[in-house]
Amino acid sequence: MAAAGEGTPSSRGPRRDPPRRPPRNGYGVYVYPNSFFRYEGEWKAGRKHGHGKLLFKDGSYYEGAFVDGEITGEGRRHWAWSGDTFSGQFVLGEPQGYGVMEYKAGGCYEGEVSHGMREGHGFLVDRDGQVYQGSFHDNKRHGPGQMLFQNGDKYDGDWVRDRRQGHGVLRCADGSTYKGQWHSDVFSGLGSMAHCSGVTYYGLWINGHPAEQATRIVILGPEVMEVAQGSPFSVNVQLLQDHGEIAKSESGRVLQISAGVRYVQLSAYSEVNFFKVDRDNQETLIQTPFGFECIPYPVSSPAAGVPGPRAAKGGAEADVPLPRGDLELHLGALHGQEDTPGGLLARGHAPHCPGACQRVEQGCAEFTDVLLGPPPPGYHPFLFLDSLHKKAGGRSRGGLHPRGTPPTAQEPPGGSRPEGRATEEQAAAAHLGEYVLMIRDVTTPPFLGRRLPPAFKHLRVVAKRAGQPPHVLEEGPEASSSWQAAHSCTPEPPAPR
């Protein structure tokens, strides 16, 4: 019984094979004791040596060269946890040297690596398709490099830890160019910009913005400007900074001159009470800072022009034509109306021409030979006849008559009309009364995303004296005081109640 029982399977314990040892030489497969690693490939003296494939239980793997049991040489490594794959040179298990990294999230890198990180010169395409070519340090863009952004902008210059810093040139997709200093990815320091609109700025930049940027438009001259009926005049404009200094670092903004006529006149200052506008020619009222409203009125400046923009100092010159949209602007655009040239002609307005625009040069601009024309079709002046009827003992105070029934503002009180050339000049001139000049920033596209607020000048058209020369606005504070002294007989209109 005992002899028979020794040979039965039930009487023997489970058979355990001794652990396999790695192959000595040649090709072999070895599963490590912890079963996480599996190697298939060439062996030499019991070590992985030559070409082989090391598989990890989580799905990661390396396939390539081995030297004395270590991953060294050319190979391909895939990380299951990230999905990234590197093909290139390895030293002691880490990417080292030159190779290509493909990212699961999108994009790839080709270039030099050290200890598994981008180091040295390389070519990077990110998940958004943006391309960088240049120096890397500690896995970041660092040193000189070029970048093509998703929106089409191109940067060529210095980088510090993935940010543009130092000196660089940015060429935007819209045609704008910045050359100068950077800090923390924004314009900072001395630099110049040639904007696609034609605006140029050369000077100091702080946190991405010009340190000497224009913030407002100012029309030089007295508080209330008087011009003779039918006479051309000049308008000088300055762009000022917040603290009142002229923005001399800036050139190229396109300024448009336009005018409005006072919608309700006061009897003390004009015989014209207001303009009645036909229903088909209704205009939106323009609010002015003078306490009254006005409606658009035609103005011309035939001597004005819009020269091509000049590049910033140190940059290449460029001639950018005035955007076509600017040529079609008209007075109604001041309050948001959108009219085509054909629509303006149908309504009696001439389409806007380049003569009404002027480019700024070092913070200053001048409009010469500015002239207020006759009222457009559909504008009918009404006369305030209070003063006339007081003298003539006429009807009750405040009577209103449309032009053509009583003596008009162009006629002497006695009713006799001037003859010949004088009559023609008056017919082609603006009526006596209260007007407003407006200077508007129409730079397209707006410089750095914003336009300057419009500037206003109170204008009074008075009867022309014989031999009176054209009016020219002088500059400086002395001009305002001397003008007011010379015209002290003209009272200022009271604020509306």
UniProtKB/Swiss-Prot annotation:
Gene3D superfamilies: Histone H3 K4-specific methyltransferase SET7/9 N-terminal domain (2.20.110.10). Signal peptide: none annotated. Pfam families: MORN. The keyword Repeat applies. Residues 1-27, 393-425, 468-497 are annotated as: Disordered. MORN repeats lie at residues 39-61, 62-84, 86-108, 109-131, 132-154, 155-177, 178-200. InterPro entries: MORN. Keywords: Repeat. PANTHER family: MORN REPEAT-CONTAINING PROTEIN 1, PHOSPHATIDYLINOSITOL-4-PHOSPHATE 5-KINASE RELATED. This is MORN repeat-containing protein 1. It comes from Homo sapiens (Human). The gene is MORN1.
